[in-house]
Amino acid sequence: MVDDAEKKLLADVGYRIRETRAGQGLSLEQLARLTGISAPALSLIETGKRDPRLTTLKRIADALRVPPATLMADGSDTIEPSASATSEGYDLGEYQ
């Protein structure tokens, strides 16, 4: 089951793909031809209804001529550790 955070991530990634594609003047069908991914599958990704594999995101990014991270970025310049990571830390056990 997909939780709310995952739904938001999928919707955000889809939005960035759609905005990048549209900004480059590409139709969904044109991107489909460039990636080898069907237009209906791309539509599901763009609307956040399908969870694309990393290799699929790479194909889309390559076709759009952007780094794959661009499609995953949330607009912030820095990555902040989550509250649980900083308060609980990590148990490295035998790796220390």
Regions found by a protein language model. Name each.
Residues 1-23:
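A short, Lys/Arg-rich alpha-helix, primarily the initiator
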Residues 15-34, 59:
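Short basic helix-loop element that most often maps to the first helix and adjoining turn
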